[in-house]
Amino acid sequence: MYIGIAGNIGSGKTTLTEMLAEHYQWEPRYETVVDNPYMDDYYKDLHRWSFALEVFFLKERFKDVLQISESENNIILDRTLHEGVFVFAANNYAQGNISDRDFETYMELYEIMVEKVKLPDLMIYLRSSVPHLVENIQKRGRVYEQKIPIEYLQGLNDRYDDFIRNKYKGKVLVIDVDKLDYKTRPEDLKLITDQIDSVLSI
């Protein structure tokens, strides 16, 4: 079984991935952020580095999903191939950070890749307001994230809603996380696991 956790920057994906992996004894896989050689440059100059950053992420996510497809383990993945394309890369393109030519090349790469992999058995989307995202980003203190514009986060939120409603073809569980604190309140985690159990018939 393959579960994907989707959500904006600061929505709590990694924390929930860790907790669900422990709860269900699933194997967690995490997005490669620290190792992305373009990350610091990207936040300093979005226009110059967006295409390189997105291609790097696309390559890493494709490698992850290929490994998952060959594994017999139950795996939960922090951020999916598909949201990387239809949310983050599409947002960079819409904001003029990726040229028409580069985006066309990027989408052609994605179309080749997506034919080789399956959709998650369940996509869990953590929906969050921008103020909640900003609060979480400030708390965790990653230096390269502190200068992210509010407009950028709002653009990503809009893209996520469009992605979940109109573009993604698989099974989705939407969880509004603004009023949840599953890291410190067991009852909040149980609210989530009860929904997962119901959707997956566990």
Predicted stretch roles:
Residues L16-T17:
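Post-Walker A alpha-helix
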Residues R61-R101:
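A basic- and aromatic-enriched beta-loop-alpha substructure that forms the phosphate/nucleotide-
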Residues V134-I202:
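NTP-dependent small-molecule kinase module
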Residues N8:
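P-loop (Walker A) phosphate-binding loop of NTP-binding proteins
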Residues I5:
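Hydrophobic anchor at the beta1->P-loop junction of P-loop NTPases
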Residues E22-E60:
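Conserved substrate/cofactor phosphate-moiety recognition/catalytic segment
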Residues K13:
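Conserved lysine of the Walker
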Residues V87-D158:
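A glycine- and Lys/Arg-enriched "phosphate-lid" helix/loop adjacent to the NTP-binding pocket
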